[in-house]
Amino acid sequence: MDSVLLHEEAEGYIQSLEKMSLRDIGSPRWFRQHEFIEKLNMQAILNASANQEEFIKDLFVSLGKIPTLVHAMILTEVWKHKVFPKICKLQDFNPKSTFLLYMVIHHEATIINLLETIMYHKESSEAAGDCVLDLVDYCHRKLTLLVGRSVSGEISTQDRITHTQISGTASVQDLQKQSDMLEFEISIKALSVLCYITDHVESLSLSVLSRMLCTHNMPCVLVQLVENCPWKRGTQEKYTEGKWRAVLPEDQLKLSKHDGQVWIALLNLMLKPDCQRKYDFNSFNKTQLLKLRGFLTDVVIDQLPNLLDLKHFLSQLALTDPVAPKKDLILEQLPEIWNNIVMENDKKWKAIAKYQVTNVFNPSESELREQASRLAQTYNLDVMENLIPDKPKCGACGRTGVKRCSRCQGEWYCNRECQVKHWPKHKPSCNLMAEAFQKLQEEMKISS
């Protein structure tokens, strides 16, 4: 299997990662660190999918750089909330290329993807230290956003244009739309990270447990996800492997990965003794949790047998009123990253936006060519093929794909009929990707 990084290269990349300021976002130093994280993410996925030694995870743990990764992710999140909207409102901002802006928007997704891979392991949660609290808060923000958009019907069923497809000529308004679509993907990854944190809750501080159960009432958030199931569109489509895909008739009752993660997180937060002692089973929480009984069918339990224990627990809960937890006087740690970033930059958002528009997001032709060249090296398509865990699926019907779109090389089909049927939906992304590849090739020719 192809490799993105050798062990020694990865160690150098991880050792060089540093915390940056909001003003630094998009700078050459930031862009170089973004490239490092992209490559580390690719290598981590390659190792995990091939059941190889996960040296990327080991290096992040041993070098103590997981907090740096979490800080970079939340820094980008704050930038997207506070600075990006102000950039979009600047009427005199007409950049030659919006590509660098998209890289910043995509940065958060890259990091949560990397965290999804490395936080699967208990030692990663332990090595994250106090920033697990920040990670819990981050996951809560994303999951409540996911529930809210699902309830209001705001979740787009279009596939997002990826970083290898985006055209440098896309408008700022196009980027806003892509950013909104990317939030859904990020929220799905945040669910994975939360699930892994609940797996390792015994080895984490009581503050983490209190944050999940008392501050954020995560069990009730998870109940909302079971009820609304934002990764399903009726019985026809499911969101899997980063795309909306048609569901085969024989798979309609099958639990998806995301369904399983919600149930596992509920099992961890409801059945572990420390959690039961900490959680307040008041009348509201009890009513919410008992809604789960309607979803615990024999078909579901057959796929996740441990859910039988949850079903028994809920039956017992329906007949009893658990004693409220003791409110002991304890000192609890609090998450700091989001609040510190906001406090440091309060009332400076517009000034930062103007500075970045002038000095960062309006690069010269030579700078654009250099970025295009480095991008081509980072996103090695031969290596990226190996990041797909299973055989490619037909974009129209969901069965195994055997041929890909000859124009963009980004979508697979099982036969010509499916390709023709799917063309109206695929055409916009196909055009963007074809234009991006053509533009990249032209810039590479100019630079050489």
UniProtKB/Swiss-Prot annotation:
Question: What Gene3D superfamilies does this protein's entry cite?
Answer: 6.10.140.2220
Could you say which residues bind Zn(2+) 1 here? 394, 397, 414, 418
Give the record's keywords alphabetically.
Cell membrane, Cytoplasm, Cytoskeleton, Membrane, Metal-binding, Zinc, Zinc-finger
Chain positions of all zinc fingers (MYND-type) = 394-430
Q: Name one GO biological process term.
A: positive regulation of motile cilium assembly
> Disrupted gene: resulting phenotype?
Ciliopathy phenotypes: appearance of 3 otoliths, kidney cysts and dilated kidney tubules at 2.5 days post-fertilization (dpf). Motile cilia in the kidney show disorganized cilia bundles with either severely reduced beat amplitude or paralysis. Olfactory motile cilia are nearly completely paralyzed.
GO MF entries = zinc ion binding
* Pfam family of the protein (one): zf-MYND
Major place of localization? cytoplasm
Its quaternary organisation is: Interacts with LRRC6.
State the similarity comment. Belongs to the ZMYND10 family.
The protein's name in its UniProt record: Zinc finger MYND domain-containing protein 10
Species name = Danio rerio
